[in-house]
Design a protein with these regions (language model features):
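Short, small-residue-biased leader/transition segments that mark boundaries at the very start
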Residues: 2-9
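The catalytic core of metal-dependent phosphodiesterases that act on cyclic dinucleotides
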Residues: 125-200
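Signal-transducing alpha-helical linker
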Residues: 12-16, 20, 26, 72, ...
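Active-site core of bacterial EAL-family cyclic-dinucleotide phosphodiesterase domains
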Residues: 13-70, 107, 169
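Residue-level detector of anion-binding/catalytic polar loops
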Residues: 31, 101, 166
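Anion (oxyanion) recognition and catalysis
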Residues: 26, 96, 161
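Catalytic core of bacterial c-di-GMP phosphodiesterases, primarily the EAL and HD-GYP domains
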Residues: 42-49, 75-152
Length: 203
């Protein structure tokens, strides 16, 4: 034995990827795009969904499916989630200055939601943007991330509602415990990408 420490390639690669994502966050390489939500009858824009992309200096614009799974269970996902919240609220504040007031939804994973200080930190972030009225920011909880201890999650969602934040379940119908979530979590909206009857994708 030479005493040189090595590690399995997949583990090394994952660590390197996570380090690069952290560097990207520090360098402001992430951007938000806003997908409009339109009333089909009136054609009016009634909201927007904030979609994160990574403006990588070598790889170009990287889709979230290519980097978010790498940090789904890593504390870095909490940092990125807070960046998304701050960026979306800052954009909403700018739109409001221009006379545009529309609700915006952002995705949040279960690790972020289950942080013990989540509500406290959310309240602190909201306080930085006092011009945004209650009910204008929505948290789309990604159901495919493991939601543990539904009682605590339910209490957190209730606390968010007290702050004027709407909560919804994203990807509803993709997990084995979907109906349990529906019964036990006080969310205000369900966002389903699957049909219960046919199993066909909506998007």
């Amino acid at each position: 034995m030479t005493g040189v420490q090595t590690c399995a390639l997949p583990i090394c690669s994952l660590h390197e990827d996570q380090t690069r994502i952290q560097l990207g966050l520090n360098r402001n390489e992430f951007v938000l795009f806003y997908q409009p939500q339109v009333n089909l009858k009136s054609g009016e824009v009634v909201g927007a969904e904030a979609l994160i992309r990574w403006q990588h200096p070598e790889r170009g614009l990287v889709a979230p499916n290519d980097f978010l799974p790498l940090i789904e269970h890593h504390p870095l996902s909490v940092d990125l989630g807070e960046w998304v919240l701050n960026s979306a609220l800052a954009q909403m504040t700018e739109w409001r200055r221009q006379g545009v007031l529309i609700p915006v939804s952002v995705n949040i994973n279960s690790l972020h939601l289950r942080q013990l200080d989540f509500v406290e930190r959310l309240e602190a972030i909201l306080s930085l943007y006092p011009s945004i009225p209650n009910g204008q920011i929505e948290l789309e909880i990604v159901e495919t991330s493991s939601l543990e201890n539904l009682e605590i999650v339910s209490e957190t969602i209730d606390a968010c509602r007290q702050l004027g934040v709407i909560c919804s379940l994203d990807d509803f119908g993709t997990g084995y415990s979907s109906l349990s979530y529906l019964r036990r979590l006080p969310v205000e909206k369900l966002i389903s990408i699957l049909s219960f009857s046919t199993g066909s994708r909506r998007r």
